[in-house]
């Protein structure tokens, strides 16, 4: 191994780890958005708050918090999750909190 390669290899590993971390944050955000949408859909159908929370938690990352607020003819579901950093060699990368809201119109007759 040349000296140049020995100098570049740690930087390449760090950049790769950072890219994996960013990708995991993006995937976590997508799961939170999907969970909020699913919860809002169930709540808008009239299945009740407990069913909406359960539906959202099935899709959300583990440990996520789900809230359902019904206001007039709309229902808003908010999902928030704390995503841990990657740990290991790159343990200095922080975790992040991701959140999403979904609003749905309550179906007529519900």
Task: Say what each PLM segment does.
Residues 1-51:
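Alpha-helical assembly-interface signal, strongest on the long, hydrophobic N-terminal helix that forms
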Residues 45, 49-110:
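Short, conserved structural patches
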